[in-house]
Amino acid sequence: MEVQKGLIEAFYNTYPLEKAKELDKSPLCSEYELFIKELWPSIVESFHNSTEFETAIRFCCYETARKSEIGLEERLKCLFAILDLLVIGNEINESFCDHLLPFLILEELMDIHTVNECAKLYEYFETRPSLMKGIVSNRGRGPVLLRISNELLRRLSRQENSSFCGRIDILLSKAFPPEERSGANLRGDYNTVHSFGKVELSPPSTPISDRTDLSYHKKLNTLFTAYWDLQCMCSNPPKLLASDTLPKFIDAAGSAIQAFESILQNTFFNGKSNPTIDPNSSSLLSEKYITLDKGFPSKYIYSRSLFEYQLSDEDFRLQAILQLIIIFDFLLDHSKERIERRTLEKWTNKAVIPIVILSDEDTSKLNELSKEAYSFLHTARCGSVQRTIKEIIHIEGNWKLWKGLGCPSLEKPLVDKAAIDEAVEGLKKLTNTPVKLRFAMGNAALSRLWEQAGENTLDDLKKEERYRIPSPESFLSGVKADKFEIEEAVRDDDKHFHEQSLATKTWRAFRSAINSHLQNFSDTGLGDVELLCNSIEGKPTTSKITPSIPPAFDIHIIEGEELLEEMKKRENVKHNSQNFASPMQTDAEGDIVQNEEEKESVEVEEGKHKNDLPKVSPKPPTEGVDSEVNGESLVQVNKVLKSEDDNTSEASKDPSSHVKSPENIEKLKQNDDHFEVTEEITSTINSKISEKQENNVAETILEVTSSPKSSENSQKQSEITKKRGRDEEDEPSDLHSSPKRPKTGEDGEIVL
């Protein structure tokens, strides 16, 4: 005792405990560390060796723990101040102070304190995380910490001290990595300590007379046996894979789930109300035994008399369903599908690789039961519990995969120095000034478009005019401006630029109107935007020739002036051919005869034919057709009629020549078929022009109008043609004018 007192006195003389407690408010702070470094030489001089110093520390800790006159908080402060001295002393001089001494002293103190006091002592590890750095489970402070923690877990009750158990597990998870062998359970062993024995049903205490009550009690007894048999089988899951146990488990689980569903639908108790318990009953436990945390599952008593009340408890049914879902997932790990998946994942831990393989029938039954259990959860708790359980099962699948791969380290290895150097070089290249590109936006077109955009932003792309089809009227101002610039242009390149711009705007205007105003295209002349806009607005339009545009712009709706002149000439030739094709009355010698009514109606019909002429759409000239035909070509027709009498024989060979002979004409006059002959001759002319474009137009007219007996008549017609040609030379031809019919006298001769 004197040695003990001497050591304790020597320690307190060199180490002022009160001042140490004041400085140690923040555990292992820098001020406290400086204070210990100043005192350490005097502490070392007070003791002969490290053993004497360690013995003095133990005596001081035991004496402080025995002092009952001071409170627990004050005793803990003194103990923590002494233990902190050991930690700092080990950093100063490892040979004089062992690094295991604080842990060993705490292990000894845990054995002489109660559970509540141990919970306070365990705070020393939680408030000093620096002690957990570099700790391993197989040497140094690691095994001591594991012994302290495991011993406390064995002493603690999971129901009454659940929070303290959680603190221990959290500290161990922070101190040791997940792949630590001591906590990984590599073999997948199950805790079979709380196993059930064989379930025996005791007979009811009171006899049952009513048949309804008899069937109800029989059903209740069957469910009681099935439920507690499930508890016996679930206490050791590997035994469920036996051939004689698995069918019993499937039947018992199915009956339990069906009973829980019938209770949920109020059909299990045969119309009776759910059993209730009198809250004032003296048989109930006191409040301190039943006020437990709602997050901790209750532990139910095995009793037939209480089973009816347990079934009415929703938490009881929920706990049973969750237990079944976990067991179903364990059994389905032995199905063929999951085993094949694990083969592909290349599991290396053979201890957890399933050996027994379920049959397809058992797999389908377990899948159906699992679906029924999840459906019950969805109905009972509106799907919230169901989603939580599915997420937990999914996370557990990841832990199974990790354990099957041999619990590899979850920490990523350090990056190789070569990879770091490569990354640094890449960053330097990114920070260097890039080479200036020829085109900032990738090509010339995009760069020019970007420069023209100016201060336009992405909001401008949302404007309506960016995606709305423009109206033809929107191009009219631009077309007028381009026409003005073309007229005022001095340089050829400026004129060329505005001609291209005019062609583009014209094409876009007609393209925008093609779906809505196609009917107005006939009033636009040869592609005039102004005429198109006037036609759309309902204004009267007049024929207007659009300036010629070079064909290099590929604008097909606008033609040049030369093509326009050729179209006019072709229309004049066609009108003249229709004039010669009109039927006339002839006498026996072939002379033209005209009665008085026809004389009077000649002038009237002249005005009609001006409006009756069909509109001919302009067509581009084709090869083989003479485009120089004009009003003077009719004079050349008379010369051809005089000089080429041999062609009349070829005309008589024409299948349609019998229609044009004088005899047939006389017959047609008798049958009053004057207009039919006219239509047939006109159609013949049109067909000849389209089929024989390589021949001269005058030859086609000669072929239709000539006959063997009309040589004298053709001579008279040539004189008329000469006179008509001279008149047409004096007067310019009009695109919409019609040729006049020749006037004849009473004897049928033509009056010039």
From Swiss-Prot:
| Polar residues: compositionally biased ranges | 695-718
Where along the chain is composition biased (Basic and acidic residues)? 601-613, 641-677
InterPro entries with a match to the protein in the record: THO_THOC1
Q: Where is this region: Disordered?
A: 596-752
Give a yes or no for keyword Phosphoprotein in this entry.
Answer: yes
Q: Which GO terms describe its biological process?
A: mRNA export from nucleus; poly(A)+ mRNA export from nucleus
Q: What is one Pfam family matched by this protein?
A: efThoc1
GO CC term, one of those recorded: THO complex part of transcription export complex
Q: Which residues carry this modification: Phosphoserine?
A: 202, 582, 707, 738
Q: Which UniProt keywords apply?
A: Phosphoprotein
Highest taxon in the source lineage: Eukaryota
Protein name as annotated? Uncharacterized protein P25A2.03
User: Disulfide pairs?
Assistant: none
The organism is: Schizosaccharomyces pombe (strain 972 / ATCC 24843) (Fission yeast)
Where does the sequence pass through the membrane?
Answer: none
